[in-house]
Curated annotation (Swiss-Prot):
Record's GO cellular component terms: cytoplasm
UniProt source species: Yersinia pestis
Name under which the protein is recorded: Putative pre-16S rRNA nuclease
SS bond list: none
Lineage: Bacteria, Pseudomonadati, Pseudomonadota, Gammaproteobacteria, Enterobacterales
Described function: Could be a nuclease involved in processing of the 5'-end of pre-16S rRNA.
Length: 140
C-alpha cells in the first residue's frame, strides 16, 4: 500500500467539509469546512489548502439516495470534482457518502452534545467518514 496523502471533500451547497488522511495508516482527521455560495467555494481557499497539503489524491463524497440512485445534488458534486481536477490537475475519486452526515452528527453529539453540532464541524466530520470509507473499500 502506498503512503499517499489524500484529502476528502464533503460537498454541500452552503458548506464543504474537508478531511485529510494517510493511505498507509488508513486514518483521517477533520481539517476545516469552507463556506460555499450555492455549491461554489472560494477557489483561492481550496488552492491554498491543496498547496499546503499537496495531496496525491482527492476524494469527493457522492450524495446518493438510499436506494443508490442519483439525486440533483449528485450531479453538482460530480461537477465540483471535475472542477477540482480541471483547475488544479489533481487526481479525483468519487465515494458514496450515504449516511455520512448522520454518522458524523452522532459521533460529534456523543463527544460534545448539541454544542458540538455546528455546521462546519459536522461537514468536516462527514469528510472524515467519507475518507475512512474510501480507505475501507481500497483495503478490500
Amino acid at each position: 500500500m502506498a503512503n499517499r496523502t489524500i484529502i476528502a471533500f464533503d460537498f454541500g451547497t452552503k458548506s464543504i467539509g474537508v478531511a485529510i488522511g494517510q493511505e498507509v495508516t488508513g486514518t483521517a482527521r477533520a481539517l476545516t469546512a469552507f463556506k460555499a455560495q450555492d455549491g461554489t467555494p472560494d477557489w483561492q481557499q481550496v488552492e491554498k489548502l491543496l498547496k499546503e497539503w499537496q495531496p496525491n489524491l482527492v476524494v469527493v463524497g457522492l450524495p446518493l439516495n438510499m436506494d443508490g440512485t442519483e439525486q440533483p445534488l449528485t450531479a453538482r458534486a460530480r461537477r465540483f470534482a471535475n472542477r477540482l481536477h480541471g483547475r488544479f490537475g489533481v487526481q479525483v475519486a468519487l465515494q458514496d457518502e450515504r449516511l455520512s452526515t448522520v454518522e458524523a452528527r452522532a459521533n460529534l453529539f456523543d463527544r460534545g452534545g448539541y454544542r458540538a453540532l455546528d455546521k462546519g464541524s459536522v461537514d468536516a466530520a462527514s469528510a472524515v467518514i467519507i475518507l475512512e470509507s474510501w480507505f475501507d473499500e481500497q483495503a478490500g
